[in-house]
């Protein structure tokens, strides 16, 4: 196991508790830069940055969709390892959506912080072995997920959020 955890926690295989679902997209001829009836926003990694470029696709081609607040992971290249809170819409092939196998087992924000952690990010560096670095769901078979009791997950999330608030306040005063 990566490190010692409290006796009330459990080490789980990532894929036993979470699933990764890669995105999809139709051919570019179906892309529109203007929203219209029967279309949905197709989110790409660039849309979660400072200069989004909206693209819309017919709803019937939106095979992979997210709800607001879902967790998306960047899968390839220079964005590999970035973690996003999704907007409602479709997501493209450069991203993967995190699916919770049991919604009452893991708090979404706890999982979000897990994907930002060295435990995930370090393993991701190990498995991305090509020039166009990337991952697929089977790469997560040997990845571990530390699972505290549900209530403790919220305490961890609160502590992390409090730390970020403090860091932001300090940075603002520099």
Where are these regions (language model features)?
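A short glycine-rich beta-alpha junction/loop motif
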Residues: 76, 89-96, 129-147
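Short coil/turn segments at secondary-structure boundaries
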Residues: 27-35, 126-127, 172
């Amino acid at each position: 196991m990566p490190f010692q955890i409290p006796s009330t926690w459990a080490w789980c295989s990532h894929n036993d508790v979470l699933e990764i679902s890669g995105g999809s997209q139709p051919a570019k001829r179906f892309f529109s830069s203007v929203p219209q009836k029967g279309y949905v926003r197709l989110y790409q990694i660039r849309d979660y940055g400072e200069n989004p470029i909206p693209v819309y696709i017919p709803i019937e081609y939106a095979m992979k969709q997210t709800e607001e607040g879902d967790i998306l992971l960047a899968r390839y290249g220079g964005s590999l390892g970035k973690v996003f809170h999704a907007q409602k819409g479709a997501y493209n092939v450069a991203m993967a959506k995190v699916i919770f196998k049991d919604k009452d087992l893991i708090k979404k924000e706890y999982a979000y912080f897990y994907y930002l952690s060295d435990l995930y990010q370090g393993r991701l560096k190990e498995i991305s072995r090509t020039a166009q670095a990337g991952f697929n769901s089977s790469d997560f078979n040997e990845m571990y997920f530390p699972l505290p009791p549900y209530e403790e997950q919220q305490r961890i999330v609160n502590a992390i959020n409090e730390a970020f608030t403090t860091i932001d306040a300090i940075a603002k005063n520099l």
